[in-house]
């Protein structure tokens, strides 16, 4: 339990608990990134003035030193639940509803008005939802698994599929890992519908 609690900001939307602000992730630059779905109406009060967002969703970026906050939209994503940074500090954002994942850096500057036209990192083969994601990096896994991408899935499968994510021109592209017979080579999979992984981190 904290010795002292300081209330810094108020006004995060709570219209829809599935869309409310979550997926808190610290970037390599020390900023706190947070995701919010589109079915919300946030009315933040900050030391720098109010920030209003109605039905926009996307990623919030907060500087903990100055308490400045900004927001950028994520076209083609509606209910973002997954945020993870690779070793180079490049963010990958995953939509909870569709499990589509996108590279966030090209989106983090100017605002985009539409919700289409985004190239996703890989074909998720209809898997959904994406509850949390991670780049695998652990001494508990063999060398060939290090750096692979995974997310938790609980509807089309109960488990965590594995993907490659590599440089591809000016962005990233990946693919689901397969066995020699073409079947998915998942990190973990269960036939028990009560097995519902949520946060790979």
Please place each PLM-identified region on the residue numbering.
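Beta-propeller domains with acidic blade repeats across secreted/periplasmic ectodomains
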Residues: 1-201
